[in-house]
Design a protein with these regions (language model features):
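Eukaryotic intrinsically disordered, low-complexity regulatory linkers and tails enriched in Ser/Thr/Pro
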Residues: 1-104
Length: 104
């Protein structure tokens, strides 16, 4: 799964550790935990927690979808049209974009 921050930068979920506090969400590369990257900034901690819950839910969905296997994805693409389905899968299943503060 890909994680996209509020500015559009892209991070591989499996290569980062994500933490939050005081309305801010950071990523730390597993290979160098001394570095950190700002993923999202919210006006309240409650909004940050909602964003994190959405991330957890979307990650769970992506793992469930991944478990269906290649054949299910192939069937979905042939049923719904390749370009539209690939775009849907990438934008909604295999990536997560942190919402802007005003989207909550």
């Amino acid at each position: 799964m890909r994680i996209i921050d509020q500015n559009g930068c892209d991070y591989p979920y499996e290569s980062i550790a994500i933490s939050h506090g005081d309305g801010v969400i950071y990523a730390r590369p597993i290979s160098n935990m001394d570095k950190r990257y700002l993923l999202a900034r919210y006006s309240t901690q409650e909004k940050a927690e909602k964003a994190m819950q959405k991330l957890y839910d979307d990650y769970d969905l992506s793992k469930r979808f991944e478990a269906l296997g290649y054949k299910a994805v192939q069937n979905l693409i042939s049923w719904n049209g390749r370009k539209e389905t690939e775009k849907f899968l990438y934008e909604n299943i295999f990536s997560f974009r942190f919402p802007q503060d005003d989207e909550f």
